[in-house]
Amino acid sequence: MANYPAEGDVFMLTVRIATPPFKPDRSGFMEVNPGIASSYIFSLKPGDKVIMSGPYGDFHPHFDSKKEMIWVGGGAGTAPLRAQIMHMTKTLHTTDREMHYFYGARALNEVFYLDDFLGLEKEYPNFHFHLALDRPDPAADAAGVKYTPGFVHQVMLNTYLKDHEAPEDVEYYMCGPGPMSNAVVQMLDSLGVEPESIMYDNFGG
């Protein structure tokens, strides 16, 4: 779920594809049996009422803290991070904590909610958005979108944390693919960051 409470009765769901790899040598298209949830969602019509519950769990910001906050995300993992960031800014109007979001993607066309994060950066001087794309992206260059080539954990280290006075005093919030989360955790461990300062929803395993 990507929305925050102040957005009212609108629910934004960021869904990732979990189908097996496509094998074009066997057929010209992928045969996938429709799932229960996807079949239900695609059967809905405007005006239909649905019952929802959640989200559950303990992946949320420490609201009573004044520490700097760094979010790291990618793919569908940006959904809960957007909700947290929007709540900290739009709902709580937090201006006394430094906040950074390092967003990793393969290319510009895979980036969700870009306008939201760029808008927050203009509205809140204490919020900073950092986009990391795996490699130089002509589409991003043509659009004038600022980004740094490289994997997100490398970009975060090279452009910010390596010159940070006390990276161990920062709160880190992560959600994204397993390999990304693992790389970030290893990098933070090398900087002396304690596990208690790293909060994440590692849905990628």
Pin down the residues of each PLM region.
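Ferredoxin-reductase
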Residues: 1-46, 105-106, 132-136
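Short, Lys/Arg- and Gly-enriched loop/turn segments at beta-strand edges
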Residues: 2, 57-65
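A phosphate-binding catalytic loop at a beta-strand-loop-alpha-helix junction
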Residues: 69-84
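Histidine-anchored nucleotide/phosphate-binding helix
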Residues: 1, 80-92
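Short helix-loop-beta connector
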Residues: 63-67, 166-168
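Generic structural signal for buried aliphatic residues
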Residues: 50-52
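Reductase modules of NAD(P)H-dependent flavoproteins
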Residues: 98-205
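Conserved S-adenosyl-L-methionine
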Residues: 65-67, 87-99
